[in-house]
From Swiss-Prot:
This is Hsp90 co-chaperone Cdc37-like 1. The modification Phosphoserine is found at residues 32, 88. Its main location: cytoplasm. Residues 84-120 form a coiled coil. The keyword Kinase does not apply. One of its GO terms (cellular component) is cytoplasm. It is found in: Cytoplasm. Residues 1-42 are annotated as: Disordered. Residues 147-276 are annotated as: Self-association and interaction with Hsp90. Transmembrane segments: none annotated. The keyword Hydrolase does not apply. Co-chaperone that binds to numerous proteins and promotes their interaction with Hsp70 and Hsp90. Signal peptide: none annotated. It comes from Mus musculus.
């Protein structure tokens, strides 16, 4: 029996006239010939699970920046103080050592917490009764029909700049990414990070692992920039150059934190896909769709980080038109 196909995500926004053939090959939006309709309940459950995974990823990156990057800052400061022998610096040296010890303890506490969460995900048996009840409670029948101004702004942004965000997601060089964000500073925002994260889950569900890894790199880049800005209490558009400066120099501590989080994120994406027992199926019925309202179905999902421990949804499926590796390579070459 054919399993329900995932609902439209941010990749389903209307395409511009200049879209290349390779880009359309990656499109499984409702307007695509690869699309298969899905019951409302299945769509809600899939979208809910992806949204929870997205929120969890934000929490992991927040911890990485708060602990690991601050630890690198403290170690760097401690190293600079060690170069001086003045007794007047003894007090500063002691304070720096204390800060390093505290940050190491926080890092270890978070590492244990992360391991426990991953283990729980591996052992979890999805409670379908709880899922069905949760989906019903959060269905469009019980939702407030009035959208907030913030939700409307986010939806409009992702729809307006989808092609630019996709372009950024395909960049692989630090200099290219920094130059692109310098030309498009408005893309340094939470909406861009969210789009890229959701795209990663979508690509892994489609068994496009190589392309998922490319997009994952850029997703974590944007998340680190946003969390750096929050941690320093500055506008992210004013600090993204600092991130690339440290990344290109591969500064000890900073770059290691980024690489570790990138690998952890890719593992979480794969783990989520495996936990759903994804099975490619043949889509026989192609139903054209205008794609109107796709954003709303995504943005209306719950945003409460406390609900991250909830069960995730029932199995989803893939299509038989999986893009070959050479198609992915051509896609990267066109950017």
């Amino acid at each position: 029996m054919e399993q329900p196909w995932p609902p439209p995500g941010p990749w389903s926004f209307p395409r511009t006239g200049g879209e290349t053939e390779e880009e359309s090959d990656l499109d499984v939006s409702p307007s695509s010939s690869h699309y298969s309709p899905v019951p409302d309940g299945g769509a809600q459950m899939y979208s809910h699970g992806i949204e929870l995974a997205c929120q969890k990823q934000k929490e992991f990156v927040k911890s990485s920046v708060a602990c690991k990057w601050n630890l690198a800052e403290a170690q760097q400061k401690l190293g600079s103080l060690a170069l001086h022998n003045s007794e007047s610096l003894d007090q500063e040296h002691a304070k720096a050592q204390t800060a390093v010890s505290e940050l190491r303890q926080r890092e270890e506490e978070w590492r244990q917490k992360e391991e426990a969460l991953v283990q729980r995900e591996r052992m979890c048996l999805w409670n379908m009764d709880a899922i069905s009840k949760d989906v019903f409670n959060k269905s469009f029948i019980n939702q407030d029909k009035r959208k907030t101004e913030e939700e409307d702004k986010s939806q409009s942004f992702m729809q307006k700049y989808e092609q630019k965000i996709r372009h950024f997601g395909m960049l692989s060089r630090w200099d290219d990414s920094q130059r692109f964000l310098s030309d498009h500073p408005h893309l340094v925002c939470e909406e861009t990070a969210k789009y890229l994260i959701l795209w990663c889950f979508h690509l892994e569900a489609e068994q496009k692992g190589a392309l998922m890894e490319q997009i994952a790199h850029q997703a974590v880049v944007m998340q680190f920039i946003m969390e750096m800005a929050k941690n320093c209490n500055v506008d992210p558009r004013g600090c993204f150059r600092l991130f690339f400066q440290k990344a290109k120099a591969e500064e000890e501590g900073y770059f290691e934190a980024f690489k570790n989080e990138l690998e952890a994120f890719k593992s979480r994406v794969r783990l989520y896909a495996q936990s759903q027992s994804l099975q490619p199926v043949t889509v026989q019925n192609h139903v054209p769709h205008s794609g109107v309202g796709c954003i709303g179905s995504l943005e209306s999902l719950p945003q409460n980080p406390d609900s991250l421990q909830c069960c995730t949804p029932a199995p989803l499926c893939s299509v038989d038109s999986v893009v070959h590796k050479e198609d992915d390579d051509r896609m990267m070459d066109t950017v």
